[in-house]
Swiss-Prot record:
Pfam family, one: Gastrin
Residue list for modification Pyrrolidone carboxylic acid: Q73, Q88, Q152, Q216
Region (Disordered): 197-233
Record's protein name: Preprocaerulein type-4
GO terms for MF: neuropeptide hormone activity
Propiece residue ranges: 27-72, 86-87, 101-151, 165-215, 229-233
UniProt organism field: Xenopus laevis (African clawed frog)
Domain of life the protein comes from: Eukaryota
SMART domains cross-referenced by the UniProt entry: GASTRIN
Sorted UniProt keywords: Amidation, Amphibian defense peptide, Cleavage on pair of basic residues, Pyrrolidone carboxylic acid, Repeat, Secreted, Signal, Sulfation
Amino acid sequence: MFKGILLCVLFAVLSANPLSQPEGFADEERDVRGLASLLGKALKATLKIGTHFLGGAPQQREANDERRFADGQQDYTGWMDFGRRDGQQDYTGWMDFGRRDDEDDVHERDVRGFGSFLGKALKAALKIGANALGGAPQQREANDERRFADGQQDYTGWMDFGRRDDEDDVNERDVRGFGSFLGKALKAALKIGANALGGSPQQREANDERRFADGQQDYTGWMDFGRRNGEDD
């Protein structure tokens, strides 16, 4: 729209050519000025209308600006209040959280104190129980000395037992030697007894031959006896 108005003004200026009609220059100049004034007023009115259409009158724009500023101020104030409330709430929350932490610390100290009390009580109870089971410290010391003496005695006993084992080994070798001697003596005695009962080897051989002859004779006698019995039958 503005471009159309400017083109109209330019066309009006170009159409007012003073060289074409020099005799009527004053009249035409007044006409051009009147037309230009008319176009200027029209342009101003158009601009005013457009301005009012877009943003209203200057007073309206000022009022709008003030209203917008007031709205912006209100928004800013609202955001500030919101941020302040949030900050206050956060601060209050942190204060409450810190207060709860302090209370938790107090409770924790109470619990630790009670735990320390229980620990001391348990330690005292264990000490009393230990004294009851093992006696007083002097009694426990005496028991320890007695146990050490018993251990020393056991150690000495094991040493003696080992020493006795070595002595038993020696005695065992002696017994084995004496047993071997007895075995040899018994063998010799049996040999002597066998010789005494059956005579010398030559005599035993003669006895064996005699016994064989007697057996052969007995066998022959039995054969003859059987043969005679068969003939009799």
